[in-house]
Amino acid sequence: MWIDCKTIARSIEERTKERVEKLGFTPKLVSVACTDDPSALSYLKSQRKKAEKLGIAFEIMNVSPEEIVSTLKKLGSDESVNGVFVARPFPLGLDEKEILSSVPVEKDVEGVNPANLGLLLYDEEIFPPCTAEAAVRILERETNLSGKRVTVVGRSVTVGKPLALMLLKKGRDATVTVCHSRTVNLEEITKNSDIVVVAVGRAHFLKKNMVKEGAIVIDVGINYVDGKLQGDVDPSVEEIARVTPVPGGVGQVTTALLFEHVVRAAERQRK
């Protein structure tokens, strides 16, 4: 069974639009780009369309590798800008940690600054990473997480690690296992899980025999195979479990949350 993520994204967007109207001013998102990656550029185009739909001002700033850090710092003091997004991947040779640390904390709508990531250790979700939060929102709609055995396959800074912390948060109270490329007996672990979240970047990695019947599976994968977008979960898993589709799944909710964060940032800055 496929999980309906479109309805979740639409609900977030409707609430965001209502909050924009109550602000009394037009919030603004600036996306900083220092990449020629086709998928990154495509995402920036989709951001523009979504911003127009929600009544949010939007600007793309194309910068050189030498300018990216200083540009991000300047945006921090620009009162006309409420949210800052930085497109990835970065050109080879750039210090990713330095760049992400330069995203203004109070405008870090994608939740990539180490300062915002660190708050997750204290159960504070001011600007959590959008993809990790999308997985949580979907799961909370599908089930009560308390006591559920959740396996997160992947330990990235943007998905796996923050998601594990968010699922452990008091009030959600999931029992979380994080697996990775060196995990022994992965199939045994996923097969005994109520929920499996996969974010490894390998098309159709999670097979039907690795999932128990009735489980919930969140597919965070983005892989292009012969020009077609594929997830990390094999389509056959849908026969025995509830699965988020790719495309049209976690990605839609992620984008909706990005703009929810822009409005949240604007509301916090207005106070």
UniProtKB/Swiss-Prot annotation:
SUPFAM superfamilies (alphabetical): Aminoacid dehydrogenase-like, N-terminal domain, NAD(P)-binding Rossmann-fold domains
Keywords from the named record: Amino-acid biosynthesis, Histidine biosynthesis, Hydrolase, Methionine biosynthesis, Multifunctional enzyme, NADP, One-carbon metabolism, Oxidoreductase, Purine biosynthesis
Any one Gene Ontology cellular component term annotated for this protein: cytosol
Source taxonomy: Bacteria, Thermotogati, Thermotogota, Thermotogae, Thermotogales
Subunit structure: Homodimer.
Binding site residues for NADP(+): 154-156, 181, 222
GO biological process, alphabetically ordered: L-histidine biosynthetic process; methionine biosynthetic process; purine nucleotide biosynthetic process; tetrahydrofolate interconversion
Pathway in which the depicted protein is active: One-carbon metabolism; tetrahydrofolate interconversion
Recorded family membership: Belongs to the tetrahydrofolate dehydrogenase/cyclohydrolase family.
Record organism: Thermotoga maritima (strain ATCC 43589 / DSM 3109 / JCM 10099 / NBRC 100826 / MSB8)
GO molecular function, one term: methenyltetrahydrofolate cyclohydrolase activity
EC assignment: 1.5.1.5, 3.5.4.9
This protein's name: Bifunctional protein FolD
UniProt catalytic activity: (6R)-5,10-methylene-5,6,7,8-tetrahydrofolate + NADP(+) = (6R)-5,10-methenyltetrahydrofolate + NADPH; (6R)-5,10-methenyltetrahydrofolate + H2O = (6R)-10-formyltetrahydrofolate + H(+)
Functional summary from the UniProt entry: Catalyzes the oxidation of 5,10-methylenetetrahydrofolate to 5,10-methenyltetrahydrofolate and then the hydrolysis of 5,10-methenyltetrahydrofolate to 10-formyltetrahydrofolate.
Pfam families reported for this sequence: THF_DHG_CYH, THF_DHG_CYH_C
